[in-house]
């Protein structure tokens, strides 16, 4: 992959093979960001997982960095008021299902009550492709709409390792203080560690790196991230 002049100049600010403490790594990432837009800070974690294993959950980040998301709630009439008062942008049942079935996806997150999943599950061709399908594993299939929407508005995000055991997640913006992004990463790593499969032998967290949208990756020390 070819990189531009600014990328190469910024890459000289650090040693690619070095491993840095978290806040120091994030300070470097911030100093190497050069795009005219507010670059996202990305976290990459390589986990010791078998192909049959996965790590997936949600976490509320202490410092939100994205605008408020539009939440759609599939529920029956008796739960509509709760969803609306909790701040859902769209609430409904069969009417919304038909609208989504037609290809409409002008929302960021979909939540459904369990009694709606029989019908919502038929929207896989639309919601599944966009990663919007409600799922019990991510807490988006629930009767507790009030607390679920409150967490989503606070910045709850989903993390999931891919088939090669690598977890990628946006954790902040370069305009944020490195300490704030560090707190977001610590929250993520705490939850990742809790999801460690019981039969994993050796180190669970193998490598951690951070980067900005347009910048190089910086290795992060993990000696304190993998203790039992």
Regions found by a protein language model. Name each.
Residues 1, 220-228:
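Short, charged, intrinsically disordered terminal tails
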Residues 89-193:
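Long, charge-patterned amphipathic alpha-helical coiled-coil/hairpin "stalk" segments used as oligomerization
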Residues 37-41, 195-207:
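Flexible, glycine/charged-enriched surface loops at secondary-structure junctions
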Residues 20-81, 108:
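Translation machinery proteins
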Residues 75, 171-173, 212-214, 222-224:
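Flexible glycine-/small-residue-rich
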Residues 1-15:
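Generic N-terminal amphipathic, Lys/Arg-enriched alpha-helix
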């Amino acid at each position: 992959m070819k990189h531009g002049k600014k990328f190469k100049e910024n890459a000289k600010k650090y040693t690619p093979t070095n491993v840095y403490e978290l806040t120091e790594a994030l300070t470097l990432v911030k100093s190497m960001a050069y795009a005219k837009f507010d670059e996202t800070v990305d976290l990459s974690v390589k986990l010791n997982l078998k192909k049959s294993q996965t790590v997936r959950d949600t976490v509320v980040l202490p410092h939100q960095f994205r605008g408020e998301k539009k939440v759609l709630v599939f529920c029956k009439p008796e739960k509509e008021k709760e969803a609306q008062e909790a701040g859902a942008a769209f609430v409904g049942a069969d009417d919304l299902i038909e609208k989504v079935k037609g290809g409409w996806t002008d929302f960021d997150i979909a939540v459904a009550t369990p009694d709606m999943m029989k019908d919502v599950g038929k929207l896989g061709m639309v919601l599944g492709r966009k990663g919007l399908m409600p799922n019990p594993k991510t807490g988006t299939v629930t009767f507790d709409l009030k607390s679920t929407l409150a967490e989503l508005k606070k910045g709850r995000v989903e993390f999931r390792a891919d088939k090669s055991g690598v977890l990628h997640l946006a954790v902040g913006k370069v305009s944020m203080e490195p300490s704030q992004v560090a707190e977001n990463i610590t929250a993520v790593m705490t939850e990742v560690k809790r999801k460690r499969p019981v039969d994993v032998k050796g180190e669970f967290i193998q490598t951690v790196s951070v980067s900005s949208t347009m910048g190089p990756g910086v290795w992060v020390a993990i000696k304190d991230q993998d203790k039992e």
